[in-house]
Amino acid sequence: MTSSRFGRLAPGVRDVLPAEAHLMRGLKEKFTKLVETWGYKEVVTPTFEYMENLASEELQEEKFFKFLDRQGHLMALRPDMTRPMARLVATRMKGITPPLRLFYLANVFNYEQPQVGRQREFYQAGVELMGPSSPEADAEVVAMVAEYLMQTGLADFQISIGNVGIFHGLVKQLGLPKEVAQELKEALGNKDFVKVEEILGSHAATPEEARRTLDLIELRGGPEILDRAFGLAQPGPAADAIDNLRQLYWGLTCYGVERHITLDLGLLRGLDYYTGLVFEGYTVAMGFPICGGGRYNQLLAKFGLPMPATGFAVNLERVLVALERLQGPPREPVPDVLVAWEDNSLANALQCVKELRYQGLKVVTAMFEYPPAKAKAEARSLGASRVIYFDKEGKSEELSL
């Protein structure tokens, strides 16, 4: 008996038809071309690995796609690419002198509630810059993702940048217990500043300290907020993180991308391996971040190679959806030329096809003998702009459309 699921797709995955596939391939090709001009080299990691390579405190186990191999080992599909990239460098490239500039194009898997822009399987394009720990390295990856988003046609995007050192410095300064710090982190991540104010009011030493802390983490805008931030922060880790942001912003102005940058001193991302810079990119056409990244100086050490690193990932599915909303549905690729033939002229027609394809043209060959009128109708149906017709004498002519 045939299952009721036969012929259907599981929730959270989808088929990609020619028009979208063509647009997606274009996004991948633009990404590859761009990052290679910045000196980045492509690597490929397995789609699944041992669960212990991918698991961490911040990645909830129920979000993984897991299975047992025939030896009983627990395996999982990769939920992101940062940990696989860290493992790869720490185990396979540890003898290479840094900096290492690497990029990837990969599908990743998260077991979550499907909706537009949030699938269980989706494609990422990303880079990792491993070795340098400077603000200049962070500026390189942020400027690179900004340049890529510009090349996709998303002119209205903004990248919010912050530094988790501000949060950790404030937690230390306030002496917050671990569970309270986690509660504060979740409230900040949800931009629930009412809850943030409630937590600070209950645990800060004085109302003034609570107000100064809240004022600091609510700061958002251009470089003008940094002077205000320095005035609110006490000397220590939080002030150091603000200074790091100042240096980073200066680097981004050197790249000429500052109009796409917003400073957000309360920005946190969901993954605990970030140690400094964090950032997320947004566009008006998409309610979720289209890209994100940051600095993770401790992750490679978990695989035996202490090395600072920074990087980003672009969610190509979300970029595709945003482009469709802004520009309309993508168009299917069409051939440049239809070559049609009659009687015994197929050999001549195929020689012509070969020469045209050698010139880089997209050429479709008629599958049957066509009279000229049928060839022209077929060309219009395909969207071809030219028709070359071979008669029974083997002579060719270009038919007008």
UniProtKB/Swiss-Prot annotation:
An example of a GO molecular function for this protein is: histidine-tRNA ligase activity
Its keywords, alphabetically, are:
Amino-acid biosynthesis, Cytoplasm, Histidine biosynthesis
List the SUPFAM superfamilies: Class II aaRS and biotin synthetases (SSF55681)
Task: Tell me the GO BP annotations in alphabetical order.
Answer: histidyl-tRNA aminoacylation; L-histidine biosynthetic process
**Matching InterPro entries, A to Z?**
aa-tRNA-synth_II (IPR006195), aa-tRNA-synth_II/BPL/LPL (IPR045864), HisRS-like_core (IPR041715), HisRS/HisZ (IPR004516), HisZ (IPR004517)
Q: In which pathway does it act?
A: Amino-acid biosynthesis; L-histidine biosynthesis; L-histidine from 5-phospho-alpha-D-ribose 1-diphosphate: step 1/9
Q: Which PROSITE patterns match?
A: AA_TRNA_LIGASE_II
| Gene3D superfamilies the record matches | Bira Bifunctional Protein, Domain 2
Q: Where in the cell is it found?
A: Cytoplasm
Name the CDD domains on file. Answer: HisRS-like_core
A GO cellular-component term linked to this record: cytoplasm
A Pfam family per the record: tRNA-synt_His
Q: Using the UniProt record, give the first listed, main subcellular location.
A: cytoplasm
Q: What else is known?
A: This function is generally fulfilled by the C-terminal part of HisG, which is missing in some bacteria such as this one.
Q: Family assignment?
A: Belongs to the class-II aminoacyl-tRNA synthetase family. HisZ subfamily.
State the oligomer form and interacting partners: Heteromultimer composed of HisG and HisZ subunits.
- Known role: Required for the first step of histidine biosynthesis. May allow the feedback regulation of ATP phosphoribosyltransferase activity by histidine.
Q: What is this protein called?
A: ATP phosphoribosyltransferase regulatory subunit
This protein's gene is called hisZ
